[in-house]
Amino acid sequence: QKKMAEMESAGFQREKLVELYHREMDEWLQQFDARDPGFKDGVPQWRSALQTGNEWKLMELPAYWETRGLNFDGTVWFQKEVEIPADWNGKEISFHLAMIDDDDITYFNGKEIGRTSGCNTMRTYKISAALAKAGKGVITIRAIDYGGEGGIHGEPQQMYMEANGKKISLAGNWNYHTGVSMTGAPSRPLSPEGTGWPTSCYPTVLYNAMIHPFTVFPIKGAIWYQGENNVGFDEQYRVLFQSMITDWRRAW
């Protein structure tokens, strides 16, 4: 009801709703990041030097972290020390990091080199020739999983760094440290853009995409199979189902 009221106040204009979503998401991320031990006063603390200590553990990547025994929704920081070959000095370097579920921010030697949203999107980030220095370097990835499986996943051959016609694998052991858990976090804002948190949850999306286009055709009835992922909200269906059928009869 709150979201519908917001949509009505925006005149159901997509541009205004997208703008509202980005404002809400910025506020949500500020609150979320404030609880992350990897941040201090809004500044990432684990992005540069290789971190040490008993709280940092090893994980073999790529893999969903649940398959490595980490049952966790939230942020996980990953680090790996790499050796930049002498013949890569002053050459643009590409980092291929397979896929990351759900979102990530990636750093090299403390400098952000890219960020991506989307659990099934291949990550490829580059550092300029000016930043490419021979010797040791540190890749830091802050992965955010909002629910379900999380982690840096894919095939080992999809994790590597590349420059000067040569590839070096990045698969294998990475250091990791959990950040902030989704447990107790406020609900993430819904996106009207078709990205981010499942757009199918956004009011009007399923109806406009899957029901309304068929109202131009005559029908005798409807039969459907129902699956559920929100059994804890069963009481809502006493009202929702009746309202849905009433609306279908009106539409046809």
Residue spans for each PLM region:
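An acidic-aromatic loop/edge-strand motif
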Residues: Q1-T67, C119, K133-N208, H212-F214
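Short beta-strands within extracellular/lumenal beta-sheet-rich domains
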Residues: F72-P85, R123-Y125, N208
